[in-house]
């Protein structure tokens, strides 16, 4: 699909028609969720954050809004929506949830479920300065260009892991965030 031809309707159709890899059973890991917010501009974008440098974990890294599940959350989708409201002031009622991707294991011991949602273009975002240093948007056609992600195989705790690395403007996108974008790009791609 040529980058200039990328449209929101194409994405929605492909997302809903292409089943993700089978969902893994939930382990005894702590649960977390992130919202993968797709902003419905004429040229759709992903909303990303750069985490505050003052945070204990993942300080200064590019991330989707999200965090750990609370006991009060009725579902993992509710976790993603609550965290997005806390971090960037997206009202849950302004999110049209399209679905979820298979959970990924984070280096901090969480099983993280990405929740894909559409956000109206006129929505105003306000970062929680305690958690978010910066907000930025990446056009979907750039985000889903599989050639922009460079694989790196590393060994952690005597197991091999593949991480993806990418740059967007001055932002370094890697780790779980890059893995989520790459996974979503593969799901909607024309590749068999």
Swiss-Prot record:
One Gene Ontology molecular-function label: manganese ion binding
The protein's required cofactors: Mn(2+); Mg(2+)
UniProt superkingdom: Bacteria
Sorted UniProt keywords: Hydrolase, Magnesium, Manganese, Metal-binding
SUPFAM superfamilies per UniProt: Nudix (SSF55811)
One GO BP annotation of this record: nucleoside diphosphate metabolic process
Residues at which Mg(2+) binds: 83, 87
Transmembrane segments: none
EC number: 3.6.1.-
Purpose of the protein: Probably mediates the hydrolysis of some nucleoside diphosphate derivatives.
Protein's name according to its UniProt entry: Uncharacterized Nudix hydrolase NudL
């Amino acid at each position: 699909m040529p980058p200039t031809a990328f449209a929101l309707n194409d994405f929605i159709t492909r997302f809903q028609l292409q089943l993700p890899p089978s969902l893994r059973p939930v382990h005894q890991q702590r649960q977390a969720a992130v919202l993968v917010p797709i902003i419905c501009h004429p040229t759709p974008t992903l909303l990303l954050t750069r985490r505050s440098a003052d945070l204990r974990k993942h300080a200064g890294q590019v991330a989707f809004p999200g965090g750990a599940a609370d006991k009060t959350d009725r579902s993992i989708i509710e976790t993603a929506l609550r965290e997005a409201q806390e971090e960037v002031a997206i009202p849950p009622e302004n999110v049209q949830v399209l679905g979820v991707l298979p959970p990924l294991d984070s280096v901090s011991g969480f099983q993280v479920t990405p929740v894909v949602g559409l956000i109206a273009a006129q929505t105003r975002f306000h970062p929680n300065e305690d958690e978010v240093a910066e907000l930025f948007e990446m056009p979907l056609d750039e985000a889903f260009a599989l050639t922009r992600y460079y694989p790196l195989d590393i060994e952690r705790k005597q197991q091999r892991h593949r991480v993806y690395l990418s740059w967007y403007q001055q932002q370094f996108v890697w780790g779980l965030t890059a893995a989520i974008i790459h996974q979503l790009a593969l799901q909607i791609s024309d590749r068999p």
